[in-house]
Every structure is written in C-alpha cells, then in structure tokens.
Amino acid sequence: MLNIGPFSFHSRLLLGTGKFPDFDVQQKAIDVSEAEVLTFAVRRMDIFDAKQPNLLEKLDVKKYTLLPNTAGAKNAEEAVRIAKLAKASGLCDMIKVEVIGDDRTLLPDPVETLKASEMLLEEGFIVLPYTSDDVVLARKLQELGVHAIMPGASPIGSGLGIVNPLNLSFIIEQATVPVIVDAGVGSPADAAFAMELGADGVLLNTAVSGAKDPIKMAQAMKLSIEAGRLGFEAGRIARKRCATASSPLEGMSVVE
C-alpha cells in the first residue's frame, strides 16, 4: 500500500491528466493504468465555470483521489493562493506544491518551494512538494513535516529518465515519508528503475499522454511499476567483478 497522510492507495502509479488527445483516450488510459490518484493543474482548469468542459465532470470523482497542483506559480504566495482555490472548489486538502524557478528547465525554485510547503502545512494541507534531486533540500522539506517528497527524475516532459540515480537513492535512503519520483520518466524501464531504487511511487503524465498509443503505454507503466516494486522487495543479487557459476559444482560427474 502507498500511504500518504491519511490516504492509502493500492496503486503506486499517480497519473497526470494533461495533453491527452481527447477525453476518451484520457479515460481509457486512466482505466487501464488502474491509477487511483490523478493530478491536474488548477490554473489550467476553470473549476468554477460550469459551461467549460473539464476533467472533473468527465470522471467518476468517487473512484479517484484528485490531486490538484500549483503549476504556474512563480512564488510561495501564488502557490498558496492556488491551493486555497482548489480547496474552495470542494477538492480534498492534499496538494502538490509546484513552484517553478526557471522557465527553460522548469526546475523547481528550492527557496520558494520550502516557503510554500511551510505555509501550506500551517494551513492544514496535506503537502506533496515537487522538488529536484537535491538531497539536502529533500531532507529540509521532510523536516518541515511534508507528507511525501516528489523528486524529479529529470526535467518535466523531457523523457530523459533517471539522470542521477545516486542522488535519488540517497533521498530514498534518508526518507521517513513516501518518495514519489516525479517528472522526466519516459519509458516503462524508467518507471521500473525508479521502483527498483526503492521509490514508493511514480507520478507521470507526458510519457503516457504523448505516447503513440497512450492506452497501451498506460498499461505498460502500470505493469512496470508493479514489477519494479516486486524486484525491490525481492532484493537483487550483488554486483561482482568476476563470474560465478550458476550451476553447482558439487556432485557433478567427471567425464574422462
């Protein structure tokens, strides 16, 4: 089970809802992924305008936990305002904090992310900050009391996969809250690798919505995350410089 604050989920795949070709493909991809948590940008959806078609009216909201994010925020104050807007619309208190500090790389602003997380915790939100693979920043966020850490594998939408597995493994090793790898995942192999490192979950969007067949890719991501988790729990063999025979030598007949 993936436990985040008071919530428990069977699926370790969290799925973003942007950039799908249409609502039908989006819904089918969500269905086959078996994701229970769906994230969306509050700023890109007019949740108060009933005339505008949006994700909330297309989905069975009782079946999913909707995770609004603060994408578009440039500072802590903007992030807090967006979070409060989501809460006022009737969504749950869980929020993904996203404060971008660089328009080219879309990397998060560490100072504003810390500040926003602290402010939202004081407001009683369940806080999941998107951060870089900075080990020290992850620890400081954890010390604030956030409910999960969401380090990026690589820049948002890049599909580069896990570019710094060493830092990611350090974050996972020191974590006392769930670590959900977020951003940059491009393939099922990337998702499986994140889980093999010990991540508690993976959040992805473009890897599915931008695939040639988003529905098949959603299923592939589901299976790879399950396989990666099983592999982590099973424990891989140690890496060695020299070969070790896979067949036992004891009891073998000697042919002369």
UniProtKB/Swiss-Prot annotation:
Q: What is its main location?
A: cytoplasm
Under the heading InterPro entries, the entry gives: Aldolase_TIM, Thiazole_synthase_ThiG, ThiG
Q: Which of the seven top EC classes does this enzyme belong to? A: transferase
Q: Which compartments does it reside in?
A: Cytoplasm
Q: Where is the active site?
A: 96 (schiff-base intermediate with dxp)
Residues of the signal peptide: none
GO terms, molecular function:
thiazole synthase activity
**Which E.C. number(s) belong to this protein?**
2.8.1.10
- Pathway involvement of the protein, from the record: Cofactor biosynthesis; thiamine diphosphate biosynthesis
Q: Which GO terms describe its cellular component?
A: cytoplasm
- Give GO terms for biological process: thiamine diphosphate biosynthetic process
Q: Which UniProt keywords apply?
A: Cytoplasm, Schiff base, Thiamine biosynthesis, Transferase
Q: Which residues bind 1-deoxy-D-xylulose 5-phosphate?
A: 157, 183-184, 205-206
UniProt catalytic activity: [ThiS sulfur-carrier protein]-C-terminal-Gly-aminoethanethioate + 2-iminoacetate + 1-deoxy-D-xylulose 5-phosphate = [ThiS sulfur-carrier protein]-C-terminal Gly-Gly + 2-[(2R,5Z)-2-carboxy-4-methylthiazol-5(2H)-ylidene]ethyl phosphate + 2 H2O + H(+)
- Quaternary structure and partners: Homotetramer. Forms heterodimers with either ThiH or ThiS.
Describe its function.
Catalyzes the rearrangement of 1-deoxy-D-xylulose 5-phosphate (DXP) to produce the thiazole phosphate moiety of thiamine. Sulfur is provided by the thiocarboxylate moiety of the carrier protein ThiS. In vitro, sulfur can be provided by H(2)S.
Q: Which HAMAP family match?
A: ThiG (MF_00443)
* Homology family: Belongs to the ThiG family.
This chain belongs to the protein called Thiazole synthase
